[in-house]
Amino acid sequence: MVVLSLPYPISTNRYWRTFRNRQIVSKEAVAYKARVAAIAAENGIKPTGKAVSLTVQLIPKANKDGTASKVCLDLDNCLKVCLDALQGAAYENDNQVEEIHAKRLKTPIAGGGLVVKVEELE
């Protein structure tokens, strides 16, 4: 089992861009995926080829006064970005994900975040 503390994900609305009538991954998405890969590498995590279960906790961003920001990603919005970012860092392909448990936490932190637990399945 591996637990990763990741930065607050970008919105799926900013994940794709249209360029010359083609959909491409945005620079923001590429940068987020690179940050996730770097965090995984720093923690000695290598991609597994086995089926996995994910537990995802979305931590809301805090306002300056410490209250939770009203601008918060939908939980399903954050999952797509999270799954794509972990591909190649925690598992080889996102079709290996057989279970997903997701929850939005109530207590905000500065900048928000994402805590992901990756467990190999038998």
Regions found by a protein language model. Give the residues of each.
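Acidic, proline/glycine-enriched N-terminal capping motif
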Residues: 1-122
